[in-house]
A protein has these predicted regions:
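Bacterial N-terminal signal peptides that target proteins for export
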Residues: 1-8
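Hydrophobic core
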Residues: 12-20
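Juxtamembrane/start-of-transmembrane alpha-helix segments at the extracytoplasmic/lumenal side
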Residues: 292-307
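Core hydrophobic alpha-helical transmembrane segments of single-pass membrane proteins
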Residues: 306-316
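Low-complexity, Gly/Ser/Thr/Pro-rich intrinsically disordered linker/tail segments
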Residues: 253-296
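N-terminal cationic leader/targeting segments used for protein routing and processing
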Residues: 23, 300, 323-326
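C-terminal membrane-anchoring or membrane-association module
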Residues: 314-329
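A structural signal for short, hydrophobic/glycine-enriched beta-strand patches
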Residues: 23-258
Length: 329
């Protein structure tokens, strides 16, 4: 009977502690991923050793997640350090069938619902690209950003393209997103769900916006696309003299939202493995913030210790005490 009680108690303890240990591991993984993004946001390639070290730690905790994030960081670095930005029209060599979708990112409308010139400039690049790749779909993405209800960026963009010669059966509209991050999330889901023939995308937007958009679409498809992942194969930009610029803050913020982890731009992890100890100057955080920045939750003490103590109490309660020797024995 004592053996049975001990066994039941042991199993009960495992059942109590196991979920907490898993939760602790999940929080640890999240913290590591936050550090990886913060390192690249603040230091770029100068934090290569720290990022590599964090990726190794993440892989030890969760091999699948670790390998996924190694690829994410490789692609993110490529987007910022090696990817060419093409102007005027998409480059040569892209798929020439309906496996390609040209994704045109929206831009805030005027108060009356009309399009600003910069958005028209994007559409002119998109139309020329669509003529160069006549089998490709064209997806316009952008929600209601004017004072006129029912008028979306995507709707206005689509109407302009149709008026200027784009075939109706090539046009796809996504009219609910209100940020670049949502452009990537909602557009990707539409293509995954409704256009399985589409395997690759090319982004059309303003010159300062290309890397930001590319980073969001890359992260969305790598982290959530699975077997339906869309390959980013090209880009085309309209040239602007806009004071806006594609900030690393916007990229880091967008990737964090897509990865479902907090992002705190003021959190500066130290460089332990590199010579430089001060982060380079980063762009002012301000600018293009259409959504609230996710708050970083306060770290909680793990409750595994508490449950372990509870398990010990249960052991004491369930295990019978040895009978004391009486004087008559």
């Amino acid at each position: 009977m004592d053996f049975f009680r001990r066994t039941v108690c042991f199993v009960l303890c495992l059942l109590l502690i196991s979920p907490v240990l898993k939760a602790d591991a999940s929080e640890q993984e999240s913290a590591i991923r936050q550090d990886i993004i913060s390192y690249y946001f603040h230091y770029r390639e100068k934090a290569a050793k720290e990022i590599e070290n964090q990726l190794h730690t993440l892989t030890d905790l969760n091999p699948e997640t670790g390998e996924q994030w190694k690829e994410l960081m490789r692609r993110w670095a490529w987007i910022n350090e090696e990817m060419d930005i093409h102007t005027g029209v998409l480059p040569d060599g892209l798929p020439e069938d309906d496996s390609l979708c040209i994704v045109v990112l929206g831009y805030g409308l005027e108060k009356d619902g009309s399009m600003k010139q910069e958005l028209v400039d994007r559409l002119e690049v998109a139309l020329e690209s669509a003529e160069k790749y006549p089998q490709a779909y064209v997806l316009c993405t952008g929600g209601e950003t004017s004072h006129e209800p029912g008028i979306s960026e995507a709707g206005q963009m689509g109407a302009w393209l149709l008026e200027n010669g784009l075939e109706q059966d090539r046009l796809i509209l996504e009219g609910d997103s209100l940020s670049t991050t949502e452009n990537a999330q909602r557009s990707s889901r539409i293509l995954w769900r409704e256009y399985p023939q589409v395997k690759s995308i090319a982004i059309v937007t303003s010159d300062y916006h290309i890397r930001w958009g590319a980073a969001c679409f890359m992260a969305m498809n790598l982290l959530h696309g699975g077997e339906k992942e869309l390959e980013l194969v090209g880009n085309a930009a309209c040239v602007t003299d806009s004071p806006n610029k594609d900030t690393m803050f916007s990229q880091a913020w967008g990737i964090s939202i897509i990865a479902d982890i907090p992002f705190d731009s003021g959190r500066v992890p130290p460089l332990y493995m590199s010579e430089e100890t001060e982060p380079p100057e980063t762009e002012a955080v301000p600018m293009i913030a259409a959504e609230p920045i996710a708050e970083v939750p306060q770290k909680r003490e793990p409750v595994a210790i508490v449950l372990a103590g509870l398990a010990g109490v249960l052991l004491i309660l369930f295990v019978p005490k040895k009978r004391r020797k009486s004087g008559s024995d």
